[in-house]
Amino acid sequence: MCFSLNINSHNINGIILLDKQEGLSSNYLLHKVKRLFRVQKAGHTGALDPLASGMLPICLGEATKFSKYLLDADKRYIVSAKLGEKTNTYDATGIIINTRPVTINQAMIEHIMEQFYGDIYQIPPMFSSIKYQGRALYKYARKGINIPRSARLVHIYNLQILDWDNTHIELQIHCSKGTYIRTIIDDIGELLGCGAHVTMLRRLAVAHYHTARMITLESLQTAITLALRQTPNTLVQLNKLLLPIDSAVANFPAIKLSKDSVARVRKGQMVAVDQCWQSGLVRMCENKGETTYFFGIGEITQPGVLKPKRLLAEKYV
């Protein structure tokens, strides 16, 4: 992986994998982390419901330029659902609007789960942050207003039954961006004929990131407090808490450019590269001494031709 954190700058640039706790909003945690690091730019890469916990990648500084690649990435979740009760929010925060007896068996569950593999269409819940005429749908829902929503195409890579009985079901789901786990549970409940709603939801992974690098808000606050005491090495200590910027695009192949090519790319010009590069997005890197530095994302628009797409500010490389 190319090196991308400049510890000599007066800014913090990188990605923190926050372990979101249940009951807090993603935006609240985003602003909390932004204040803790004292950065001007910060953004999360896909909100979690207040009920949910787990991985919430937060991009700081220059890393926000590449947040879309995490927003577009696939996600992994573990979810528990209560059977026999349907709520207006599709989760335990809502009002129970229907109760039905539960009469299910293993064969029935497995047959229904088979319908949730591959490409599926789902209608987003009314209690969501999707905008309609400039306002979030949940604001209409709270007033009892139902807005027609179009079905959206999502992809389920894997859905595994972890546990079930006549009161609950627990699943692990690997899905594409934009998938509403609450909707999957509500749909499963309807197909089972008993209704269901989410009681626990935890995000296990975003793209290639693993839980081992997650940190809770409390642990982060403690680590930052300690770092601030270690002047003049405060910035070094703070940056140790972060993943490098190019970790957001680690799935793209890296291409090393000459000094002349780097200069042209920074002017927005396309450059020639080896013909072995046929198409797709790449991480652009340059050598400085014995170290290779990441400085942006480019696209091979045709064999042997590289077009710059998103660059780090030069002072951060």
UniProtKB/Swiss-Prot annotation:
Full protein name: tRNA pseudouridine synthase B
Gene symbol of the encoding locus: truB
Family: Belongs to the pseudouridine synthase TruB family. Type 1 subfamily.
Keyword Isomerase: yes
InterPro entries: PsdUridine_synth_cat_dom_sf, PsdUridine_synth_N, PUA-like_sf, PUA_sf, tRNA_psdUridine_synth_TruB, tRNA_sdUridine_synth_fam1_C, TruB_C
Reactions mediated catalytically: uridine(55) in tRNA = pseudouridine(55) in tRNA
Disulfide bonds: none
A family per Pfam: TruB-C_2
Role according to the record: Responsible for synthesis of pseudouridine from uracil-55 in the psi GC loop of transfer RNAs.
CDD domains given in the database record: PseudoU_synth_EcTruB, PUA_TruB_bacterial
The EC number(s) this enzyme carries: 5.4.99.25
Biological process terms in GO annotation: mRNA pseudouridine synthesis; tRNA pseudouridine synthesis
